[in-house]
């Protein structure tokens, strides 16, 4: 990726997260980035293509943040060591929610602005959510649950709910409640397995 393309994507992502996807015009991205319109259109045929590129970038950022947080926080978890990585994910998400960069879930926000399921932007959001479920499934693999995919989806729903509650109500306890609920859920499944 060229440095100008990266700069455009980074600038657009920052603006889209702060102001919304539809509310942020190309002129605002150009003004903030200092890049010429011709350069933007050399890299992206449309605003939609730019949005999809920002979602791909955000997907990479999210997974990096999650992996780094898990690596940093897994050994600080108490209880069943097989759950340490998934519990660390909740702590990493709490750290994100407490940061200045937190504007809720970029993918929930984008899919709300582009609600048609066949829209390529909505498809990119749905693909991210599928990747998150796969990531969660990897984190709980040590538990050797009979239907780990369904359990991963349940934990994903807990995370989604906590992110939305934290964003809309500013209630960070939602993350702690989701973590406790996930621990109870996983414990009950692990005992039954």
Can you say where each PLM-predicted feature lies in the sequence?
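Helix-turn-helix
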Residues: 7, 11, 15-49, 53
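Conserved acidic functional residues
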Residues: 27, 109, 160
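Hydrophobic alpha-helical connector segments
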Residues: 53, 67-99, 152-155
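Short, basic, alpha-helical segments at the C-terminal edge of helix-turn-helix-like DNA-binding modules
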Residues: 56-62
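Amphipathic alpha-helical segments used for helix-helix packing
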Residues: 97-119
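Hydrophobic/aromatic-rich alpha-helical bundle segments in the mid-to-C-terminal region
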Residues: 121-127, 141-189, 193
């Amino acid at each position: 990726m060229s440095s100008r393309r990266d700069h455009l994507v980074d600038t657009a992502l920052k603006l889209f997260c702060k102001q919304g996807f539809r509310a942020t015009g190309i002129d605002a991205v150009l003004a903030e980035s200092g890049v010429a319109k011709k350069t933007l259109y050399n890299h992206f045929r449309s605003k939609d293509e730019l949005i999809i590129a920002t979602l791909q970038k955000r997907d990479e950022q999210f997974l990096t943040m999650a992996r780094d947080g898990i690596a940093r926080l897994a050994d600080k978890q108490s209880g069943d060591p097989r759950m340490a990585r998934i519990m660390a994910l909740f702590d990493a998400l709490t750290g994100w929610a407490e940061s200045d960069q937190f504007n809720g879930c970029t993918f929930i926000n984008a899919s709300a602005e582009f609600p048609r399921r066949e829209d390529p932007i909505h498809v990119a959001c749905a693909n991210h959510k599928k990747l998150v479920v796969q990531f969660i499934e990897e984190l709980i693999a040590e538990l050797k649950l009979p239907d780990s995919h369904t359990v991963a989806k349940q934990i994903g729903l807990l995370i989604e709910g906590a992110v939305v509650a934290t964003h809309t109500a500013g209630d960070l306890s939602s993350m702690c409640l989701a973590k406790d609920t996930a621990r109870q859920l996983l414990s009950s499944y692990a005992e039954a397995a």
